[in-house]
Regions:
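Hydrophobic helix-and-loop "lid/oligomerization" segment in the mid-to-C-terminal part
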Residues: 38-211
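Short alpha-helices
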Residues: 3-43, 48-60, 68
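Hydrophobic alpha-helical transmembrane segments in multi-pass membrane proteins
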Residues: 2-3, 116
Length: 211
């Protein structure tokens, strides 16, 4: 592919990039940019540590290899989550009624699905607003929206999975199912669950305009 004309393209996976660690998530790349800006301008680098909770969240949620820098960021990010999380993240944790120390598993199976539900069911901007908002009242509002989105996502997912199981051809070596009524934001999760159930290559798609 042809790279766009830009002042800079930050991607450690580029062929000519000599940055030693290639497996940062997008948020990790953003954090490196912020860190470089602070260093270049003689600012207090410790101020960037306030983002470690969000960096840990993104690193775990993106399922990047938990090695090298990713492991370090997650370790210190989880410490911040358990000691002094951002108010948006704290609001989500309370929604999940977590009382013990938050772990990477809590992010993977609790917090990340809440955040992802915004993009699946309504609009991802609601998750962004939650994470950057500083007003407690507004944070609670966005947190409620994300929680409701996730509950709706669970219901839709269950219904689609049940329908997909009925359409499944048990004799086939592959599994291809579709419907014009299936929510496009949820079918990826359903496909993963079908693979877990049948151990076969699986395609799940939502039909639109006859396709």
């Amino acid at each position: 592919p042809t790279l766009p004309k830009a002042i800079a393209i930050l991607n450690p996976k580029q062929q000519n990039c000599n940055y030693p660690f290639k497996d940062l998530c997008g948020c990790g790349v953003g954090f490196k940019f912020i860190s470089a800006y602070y260093i270049q301008n003689g600012l207090n680098i410790e101020e960037t540590y306030s983002y470690l909770d969000l960096l840990a969240l993104a690193t775990v949620a993106d399922i990047v290899p938990m090695i090298d820098e990713n492991r370090i960021y997650t370790y210190y990010g989880l410490k911040k989550i358990n000691q002094n999380p951002s108010i948006g993240l704290d609001s989500l944790i309370k929604k999940l009624s977590r009382k013990n120390n938050i772990t990477s598993s809590d992010i993977s199976f609790g917090i990340a699905p809440l955040i992802n539900a915004a993009g699946r069911i309504s609009h991802a901007k609601n998750a962004v607003k939650l994470l950057i908002e500083t007003d407690t009242g507004k944070v609670e509002k966005y947190s409620d929206v994300l929680y409701a989105n996730n509950q709706e996502r669970k219901i839709i997912e269950k219904n689609i999975l049940n329908e997909a199981l009925k359409k499944n051809n048990k004799k086939s070596s592959t599994n291809v199912v579709s419907s014009k009524n299936w929510h496009k934001g949820v079918i990826g999760i359903v496909a993963s669950k079908l693979i877990d159930l049948h151990y076969r290559p699986t395609i799940v798609f939502s039909e639109k305009d006859g396709f």
